[in-house]
């Protein structure tokens, strides 16, 4: 017998501060709870379930949360265009799981399937238990500078701090990911043959 409950929630908000500055905040929640109940009657093969039957009960819960905030700038200065986004995000995941199996401990009364009927002993009962918490924190920035809609300079930078890096040399500084790219649209500067509808050169 299986049962699942799931909750999904998503929120977002945008605020246009000026004609060139926008603030944005987003958040997501995904929570799931699973329950598994397995019953093996005493008439089943003894090697599989023992003399009085076998009962397995598992509870699994996972909660994932994500949120980010960004400031976005979009502005034109004469022949130049500027498109910038700066922000931060957090990704959080919590997992809890417990699995109880009567196989090694046995049932006190045959074919009575509940936790109270399991003969709890050091050899059986809880054969799996998970309590895990993972978190990723990030800051990031992207910028594109354009000139006469024909040349573009793209810059990105991101720094991540992961809970898996705790007690390592990367715990405080995390990991930094920069990138630089340049794009050139020849058709904005040179008359192209009619059979060329679009051209682009890019280096990174």
Language-model features: where?
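Outer-membrane beta-barrel translocator/channel fold
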Residues: 189-204
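Short, internal active-site loops enriched in acidic
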Residues: 30, 88-96, 160-161
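Surface-exposed extracellular loop regions of Gram-negative outer-membrane beta-barrel proteins
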Residues: 4-77, 81, 134-167, 171-188
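Outer-membrane beta-barrel signature, preferentially recognizing the C-terminal barrel domain
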Residues: 7, 117-138
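Short glycine-rich beta-strand segments
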Residues: 89-93, 185, 204
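Surface-exposed loop/turn segments flanking beta-strands in extracellular/periplasmic regions
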Residues: 1, 38-53, 96-126
């Amino acid at each position: 017998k299986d049962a699942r409950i799931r909750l999904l929630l998503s929120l977002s908000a945008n605020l246009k501060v000026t004609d060139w500055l926008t603030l944005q905040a987003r958040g997501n929640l995904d929570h799931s709870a699973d329950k598994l109940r397995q019953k093996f009657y005493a008439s089943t093969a003894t090697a599989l379930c023992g003399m009085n039957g076998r009962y397995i009960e598992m509870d699994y819960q996972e909660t994932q949360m994500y949120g980010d905030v960004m400031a976005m700038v979009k502005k034109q200065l004469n022949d130049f265009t500027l498109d910038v986004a700066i922000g931060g995000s957090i990704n959080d995941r919590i997992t809890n799981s417990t699995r109880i199996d009567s196989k090694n401990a046995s049932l006190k009364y045959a074919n009575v399937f509940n936790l109270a009927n399991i003969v709890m002993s050091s050899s059986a009962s809880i054969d799996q238990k998970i309590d895990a918490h993972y978190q990723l924190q990030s800051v990031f920035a992207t910028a594109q500078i354009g000139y006469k809609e024909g040349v573009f300079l793209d810059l990105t930078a991101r720094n991540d701090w992961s809970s898996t890096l705790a007690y390592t040399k990367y715990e405080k500084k995390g990991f930094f990911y920069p990138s630089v790219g340049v794009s050139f649209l020849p058709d904005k500067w040179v008359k192209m043959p009619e059979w060329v509808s679009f051209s682009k050169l890019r280096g990174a």
